[in-house]
Amino acid sequence: MINLFDNFDQGSQDLYQSLIFSGYDNRTVVINDNGFLPRNIISPYSFFANYYNEKTTKAKSFYQIQVPRFWEIKANGNYAEIFDGDQRRGKMNYFLPLAYHRIVETVEWFDRTGIIRSMDSYNCFGLRFAETIFDKTGRAVLKSYFNQFGQEIIVENFQTGNI
């Protein structure tokens, strides 16, 4: 038997812990990997990426994210924003259980009109493991997943439903 979850949100975590405490230590699979899954839980991404970490690397804090030269990062306890002069060009969302450390989960990149055009997703090792591309209305169109070497391994097309 396996435990199969769409997302590893609070409800899924509670059920998972209840099953473990009840003696049901089944293989657990999460469909939507946010990059911060516990090591004993797999996802389609982690399976196909065959990810391993030889070095002890840590998740990235907001100040470790690369931004274009002369752009500025303004951070607070909830999120960080990226500015090109006085124009907001990005937003860093923190991983909520570790928000007080300002650990980055996603970086949203905006066009000059303020519409989201792409989003980089970072994992617990500080690597960009996925990129989501948005159309001019801000709707997700394509998501690419990368292995630890930055090679594209999975592409999900939201318009056609193909992977």
Task: Map each language-model feature to its residues.
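Glycine/tyrosine- and acidic-biased, solvent-exposed loop/turn segments at the edges of beta-strands
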Residues: 1-163
